[in-house]
Amino acid sequence: MESRYLQKCLGTCLTQGLTEVARVRPLDPIEYLAFWLYKHKENMNMEQMRQREMITLEHERELAMMEQEMLERLKAEELLFQQQLAFQLELEMQQKEKQKSEDFETGQEKSFKSMMSMESTARGEEQEPMQAEELVMDSGKTLAEISDRYGAPNLSRVEELDEPMLSDNGVSAPP
């Protein structure tokens, strides 16, 4: 038979089997061809299983790579988030420190101003003690009423009564 005819009509499997029978020349060519066809079919099934397995492995590898990439992205995002959080905390700490220093400076300025006003008040009281008393008397208000400070006592005015003046010379002890 012609090889082109066999390839065209019978297919490659039977053509290869007949070629193998012609090459080996067994005693029972039909039995040899039958075993060869079984073996060929088994080899084809194994090849298909291997290809399916390779496709499955490739798919699993792609899934693993995608999962690995996602984990890397999540780690990168987490690192970025931690850096942003650390930066934000650092900014807050700097703002708190700045606020504390500003509060401290304003406190110092206020205490300095109050000390200066106390000194000037003390100087003013030394020079004009009577004028301050006259201002308090004229206004009719107590020092607590004049003062706007929180916690200053709110006491009512008490009028002093004229009491007889006793001197040490005028009073003598009985003998």
UniProtKB/Swiss-Prot annotation:
**Annotated compartments:** Cytoplasm, Cytoskeleton, Flagellum axoneme
State whether keyword Glycoprotein applies.
no
Which InterPro entries would you find in this protein's record? Dpy-30_motif, DYDC-like_DD, Sdc1/DPY30
Q: Which GO terms describe its cellular component?
A: 9+2 motile cilium; extracellular region; radial spoke; Set1C/COMPASS complex; sperm flagellum
The ranges of region (Disordered) come to: 94-134, 152-175
Q: Which Gene3D superfamilies match?
A: cAMP-dependent protein kinase regulatory subunit, dimerization-anchoring domain (1.20.890.10)
> Which keywords fit this entry according to its UniProt record?
Cell projection, Cilium, Cytoplasm, Cytoskeleton, Flagellum
Q: Which PANTHER family match?
A: DPY30 DOMAIN-CONTAINING PROTEIN 1, DPY30-RELATED
> Subunit structure, per the record?
Component of the axonemal radial spoke complex 1 (RS1), at least composed of spoke head proteins RSPH1, RSPH3, RSPH9 and the cilia-specific component RSPH4A or sperm-specific component RSPH6A, spoke stalk proteins RSPH14, DNAJB13, DYDC1, ROPN1L and NME5, and the anchor protein IQUB. Interacts with SH3GL3.
Q: Which family does it belong to?
A: Belongs to the dpy-30 family.
Name of the protein: DPY30 domain-containing protein 1
* Source organism of this protein record: Mus musculus (Mouse)
